[in-house]
């Protein structure tokens, strides 16, 4: 296989050498991902500290909020009985 460059037509030109869309052909393909955060994080020689606000969610870097972590339960709430569950989730009675 030849070691030529292939333009995948992602608005790249030969005048734009900084574009990442021109990939070399060969036994390995070069794939580059530019993070939207714009900053590189160095995880080398760092220890992770558990904090109250650190959820460790996979979606933190994507800006997706985890709504399940924000749910607060009432300390005085009791579990619903079977009849209360049926009343709460059953259809309303039909008019006669």
Swiss-Prot record:
Residues 35-96 are annotated as: Disordered. Residues 69-80 have a biased composition (Polar residues). Residues 38-52 have a biased composition (Basic and acidic residues). This is Uncharacterized protein DDB_G0293048. It comes from Dictyostelium discoideum (Social amoeba). The lineage of its organism: Eukaryota, Amoebozoa, Evosea, Eumycetozoa, Dictyostelia.
């Amino acid at each position: 296989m030849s070691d030529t460059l292939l333009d995948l037509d992602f608005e790249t030109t030969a005048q734009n050498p900084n574009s990442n869309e021109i990939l070399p052909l060969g036994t390995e393909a070069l794939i580059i991902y530019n993070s939207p955060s714009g900053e590189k994080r160095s995880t080398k020689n760092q220890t992770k500290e558990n904090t109250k606000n650190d959820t460790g969610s996979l979606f933190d870097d994507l800006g997706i909020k985890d709504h399940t972590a924000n749910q607060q339960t009432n300390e005085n709430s009791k579990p619903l009985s079977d009849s209360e569950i049926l009343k709460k989730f059953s259809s309303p009675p039909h008019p006669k």
